[in-house]
Amino acid sequence: MSKVLFVFGTRPEAIKMAPLVIEFKNNPAIEVKVCVTGQHREMLDQVLDFFEIEPDYDLNIMKQKQSLGSITCSILTRLDEILASFMPAHIFVHGDTTTTFAASLAAFYQNIKVWHIEAGLRTWNMNSPFPEEGNRQLTSKLAFFHAAPTLQAKDNLLRESVKEKNIIVTGNTVIDALLIGIKKITGSTGDVREIISLKNKLNLDKKIILVTLHRRENQGELLRTICDDIKQLALEHDDIEIVFPVHMSPRIREVVNEKLSGVVNIKLVEPLAYPGFIWLMNNAHFILSDSGGVQEEAPSLQKPVLVARDTTERPEVIENGAAMLVDPRIPNNIYSSCKKLLSDERLYEKMSQAGNPFGDGKASKKILDYFVSLEDIK
């Protein structure tokens, strides 16, 4: 029996790994264990509960004002013991977090094969996003197998001399998770209390604009500028309702609350659990976000995305027209881009009908099928 360890620590990782964990656990020939680092404690636990995944190991590493170096050291030290005890033949990591890189390095040191899910995303700028671009490039150097979500991601890996035989194009597992999630909330098997609360708070006769912001490069004075644009849009359009789940980071919460509290058609809410968030995405007119996951999910729901960044490691969604880059460093760019999408029906229709370049919801099965087909795993 082949031993496999899944390691993740943040809410986005958990969402994207959940369908893969479920798929692997349904195969009796594979012994599956799950290790969470707790890099995003509360938001991570919500996702685990929703997908009914109980971790076998919980490193619970998070402390107040912890540096990236401290997080990395904690994961390396704690995971070293788990790998020595469980002795998996393969470790699965996802994306570009500090957990991703640290877990890959720990596995590399014990000669354990690293499987990198959502591999090959690149901006080619180590400072944007930081530290994610560095994390994913370093992880690619340590990985044995690369599950690239798109052909573009595969090409990026080939440019870095990754062997083609070690790459498979699978689509993105976030679409698998989204389809599971929509089915759960539609069938009322998920936690619907949050959805009921949202319905009571919002005026669904208005156009709902969902806003999410969390990246380091959008904090500080730039976040103040973005909030000014959002406020101006809200004050000029009484036919819209802006819903902003505010990230737990004190640096974000302080600015957002100062700038946007008290505006009647701006609803500042606590971070949403996964079922509430996908319900809100599904009911939004469009989305303003710096989130990578939102860029991947929203096209499946036919929701245009304005990406509040100057670049993206997901160029496919820009190229196919489902999303648009809106550089927040350009004065009034957020405001004018939102205003245009509200008024230009042809643009809205084109973006909402562009389709999803990130797959069909079968990525997890493709990864499992490839895994069991390898000679040394049977």
Swiss-Prot record:
Gene3D superfamilies reported for this sequence: Glycogen Phosphorylase B
Broad enzyme group: isomerase
Pathway involvement of the protein, from the record: Bacterial outer membrane biogenesis; LPS O-antigen biosynthesis
UniProt-listed InterPro entries: UDP_GlcNAc_Epimerase_2_dom, WecB-like
One GO BP annotation of this record: O antigen biosynthetic process
Reactions catalysed: UDP-N-acetyl-alpha-D-glucosamine = UDP-N-acetyl-alpha-D-mannosamine
Similarity comment: Belongs to the UDP-N-acetylglucosamine 2-epimerase family.
Name under which the protein is recorded: UDP-N-acetylglucosamine 2-epimerase
Upper lineage: Bacteria, Pseudomonadati, Pseudomonadota, Gammaproteobacteria, Enterobacterales
